[in-house]
């Protein structure tokens, strides 16, 4: 009788183990197996995940109309927050972005260099349009009210602060990150100031081709 009980117990235990192993083998364990279609493209890691950057924003386009993020990012976009009176880093970074756009165009990938001004007082529509012409023929620029710009900056977790000065040639401290934003997906990647245009182009191409 004892042997029979042992056999029954062993059979039940074996069945339980088999069911458990089958469940583990066929059930995805979140978040470790969560699919990321862009995993092979990513060079950076965002604290809180990519969903924590971007979202709904409103800005003012070159024609004076108010536009949403859906209109701003209708194409794959390389987005930079800066100001036209910036004496050094802004021209370097947006020119680098323009070079990446040209490299992508050689691969038949259309991207838009986007410039969002953090200095609405001096960056009028006329000033922004002249700035865009100097950088790239497809560059689009946006401005807005202080509140609109602050909201967009917060959405993309950028930093900017106007230096205290009565001089009209005041400087604005700001972060120097460029963001890759895709239609339907929103923010997907960021590029630091020292990223080369070649790396930007290669990474952007990977995201676009897998979108």
Model-derived features: positions:
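Short, acidic, Ser/Thr-enriched surface-loop or helix-capping motifs
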Residues: 61-62, 182
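Thiol/disulfide oxidoreductase modules built on the thioredoxin-like
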Residues: 148-203
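Short active-site neighborhood of thiol/selenol oxidoreductases, capturing the structured segment around
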Residues: 67-93, 97
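N-terminal targeting signals for export/organelle localization
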Residues: 1-56, 207-211
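Hydrophobic beta-strand anchors of alpha/beta hydrolase catalytic cores
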Residues: 78-79, 113, 178
């Amino acid at each position: 009788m004892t042997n029979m009980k042992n056999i029954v117990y062993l059979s039940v235990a074996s069945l339980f183990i088999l069911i458990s192993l089958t469940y583990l083998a066929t059930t995805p364990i979140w978040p470790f197996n969560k699919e990321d279609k862009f995993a092979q493209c990513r060079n950076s890691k965002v604290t809180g995940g990519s969903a924590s950057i971007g979202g709904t924003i409103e800005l003012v386009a070159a024609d004076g109309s108010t536009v949403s993020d859906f209109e701003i990012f209708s194409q794959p976009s390389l987005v930079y927050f800066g100001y036209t009176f910036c004496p050094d880093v802004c021209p370097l970074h947006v020119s680098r972005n323009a070079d990446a756009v040209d490299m992508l165009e050689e691969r038949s990938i259309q991207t838009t260099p986007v410039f969002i001004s953090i200095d609405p007082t001096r960056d009028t529509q006329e000033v922004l349009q002249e700035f865009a012409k100097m950088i790239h023929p497809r560059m689009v620029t946006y401005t807005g009210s202080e509140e609109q710009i602050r909201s967009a900056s917060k959405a993309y977790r950028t930093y900017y602060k106007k230096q205290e000065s009565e001089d009209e040639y005041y400087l604005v401290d700001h972060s120097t990150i460029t963001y890759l934003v895709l239609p339907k997906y929103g923010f997907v990647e960021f590029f630091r100031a020292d990223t080369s245009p070649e790396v930007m182009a290669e990474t952007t191409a990977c995201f676009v081709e897998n979108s």
